[in-house]
Amino acid sequence: MDVTVQDDEIDGPFGPVPVRRYSPVAGGSDALAPTVVWLHGGGFFRGSLNQPEADSVAHALARQGYPVVTVDYRLAPLPLLGWLGSRQKRSNRYPVAVGDVLAVVQRLSNSVGDAIVLGGASAGACIAAGAALRYQDEGGKLSGVLLAYGFFHRTHPATMEKGHRPRGHRRFTHSRWALNLMNRNYLGRAPASADCYAFPGGGDLTGFPPTLHLIAERDGMRPSAELFVAELEAVGSSVERHLISGSKHAFLNHPNGNEFATGVELMSQWLNRDAPHERTHEDESAFGLRL
């Protein structure tokens, strides 16, 4: 299926938010799947719309018939080196990224209602989960949530089987100490009461939308991902968990890999679990973005 790509921008609470729309050419049919709002990872402080985890995933899903909007949310400063950045960059800690994402979801809901699936990978999964929880608490409704090798707790769980530990440089960059530092850098001076949206793990998840959770096998963030699945199940949320055998963290950044293909196929199957939402051509063009 052919895909058209358009860069746009919307107004958010912290300034303009760049987005990229991937629209499948549907051959004249008005029966379209829910729109996926997708967030790249990068530890809250790096990443862009051009990295494969954003662009390749969006292209792959759009070719399956799912409209996708990727969000260039504002990035936090480098951990321990935030003083090197601009004053504006230093201020881009929580809740800025969540606010950027919610602005996109709210604008999109004006045209497609609740036919929205919010998702992301790694840090993007954490932002997506926090934004989904806040959107729900503010009266919004989503069709579902897509999460890939995410982490969801302010302090990373300590338990990890030896065979699941990361190798290579990630033994250090994804050590529990480094991950907790990354989280503290993202949270900044936000009050502890904000944690339920910054890091939704351990909070009240009652009524959380139906969720697909893809977990990397050898990943320092896996304990948090597994715990979050258990927390969703404990409150009766619908959650479908898949462990991608042999995978490492960020496998969606490698579009030529088997794990990438497996992950996208699982997403597509899960998105197709219900009948498509009916949408008109007017809906498709009514996102209301400005160049």
Model regions and ranges:
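Alpha/beta-hydrolase superfamily serine-hydrolase fold, recognizing
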Residues: 2-291
